[in-house]
């Protein structure tokens, strides 16, 4: 059973996940971050010690949970292996990292991917967050599954391809949509209008999706009406904002292509 966990990282995912694991009864026996101050801040909230040195981490952890940027995962695992040996168990939290890369450093590795957007100061209802896991052995897969079920009511074992597909879809559904909100906000601010005016619209669109509507079935707007007059007027109004104009034009073409493909 996974009881002693070392958190590698101190960002949004490491913070939220570390706190949830701590609340669930896991013993967090150390926090590592490349920035000592950040390691100490997170460690204090988890009643453990923080460090920026791998040599100061405990070597008897049941799990080294790696929540760092993708480009740093391999380096971190290589250093953990050098410090504690080939037999440690480590799992990363990435949606797209190729787990097989870790096989050259450690015997057993896994994935603990939470499909949610995290910020340190916003505490989500973790029971509703989908958690996707995988591991290089059935034993560790079961261990991660048991750990995940203490946090979430939606735990699934998936393969690497499925995880990457989920990550791509999540980027579209969350990251890209949020960027579009940012674009909308900037356009409004430049014209002395408040972004809050769009909140009822955003809530209604979100409500329909949450309640089970097919996104394609509730699509509205000038693109699917083929209202070329309005589209051209909008594009002209965005002449002084070429980047936003490009986004508008590209998304409009995508909408029309998808809606009228049949």
Q: What does each of the following model-derived ranges do?
A:
Residues 26-27, 107, 153, 193:
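Short phosphate-binding/catalytic loops that engage adenosine nucleotides
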Residues 189, 203-262:
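Interdomain hinge/lid region at the active-site interface
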Residues 2-4, 87, 128:
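Phosphate-coordination loops involved in phosphoryl transfer and adenosine-cofactor binding
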Residues 29-33, 90-94, 112, 131-133, ...:
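Short, hydrophobic beta-strand segments that form beta-sheet elements in well-ordered domains
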Residues 1-55:
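NAD(P)+-binding Rossmann beta1-loop-alpha1 motif at the extreme N-terminus of oxidoreductases
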Residues 36, 44-123:
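Rossmann-like NAD(P)(H) cofactor-binding subdomain of soluble oxidoreductases
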Residues 38-45, 123-168, 173-210, 254, ...:
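Internal alpha-helical scaffold of NAD(P)-dependent oxidoreductase catalytic cores
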């Amino acid at each position: 059973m996974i009881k002693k966990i070392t958190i590698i990282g101190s960002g949004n995912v490491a913070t939220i996940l570390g706190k949830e694991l701590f609340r669930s009864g896991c013993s967090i026996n150390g926090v590592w971050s490349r920035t000592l101050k950040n390691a100490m801040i997170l460690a204090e909230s988890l009643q453990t010690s923080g460090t920026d040195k791998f040599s100061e981490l405990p070597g008897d952890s049941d799990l080294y949970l790696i929540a760092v940027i993708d480009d740093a995962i391999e380096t971190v695992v290589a250093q953990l292996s050098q410090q504690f040996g080939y037999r440690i168990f480590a799992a990363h939290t990435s949606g797209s990292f190729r787990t097989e890369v870790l096989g050259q450093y450690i015997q057993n590795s896994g994935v603990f991917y939470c499909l949610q957007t995290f910020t340190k100061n916003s505490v989500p209802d973790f029971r509703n967050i989908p958690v996707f896991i995988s591991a290089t052995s059935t034993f560790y897969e079961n261990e991660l599954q048991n750990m995940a079920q203490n946090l979430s009511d939606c735990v699934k074992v998936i393969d690497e391809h499925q995880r990457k597909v989920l990550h791509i879809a999540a980027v579209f559904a969350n990251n890209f949509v949020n960027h579009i909100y940012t674009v909308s906000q900037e356009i409004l601010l430049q014209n002395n209008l408040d972004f809050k005016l769009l909140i009822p619209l955003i809530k209604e669109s979100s409500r329909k999706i949450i309640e089970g509507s097919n996104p394609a079935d509730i699509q509205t707007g000038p693109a699917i009406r083929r209202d070329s007059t309005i589209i051209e007027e909008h594009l002209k109004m965005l002449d002084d904002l070429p980047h936003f104009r490009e986004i508008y034009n590209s998304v409009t073409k995508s909408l029309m292509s998808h809606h009228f493909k049949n």
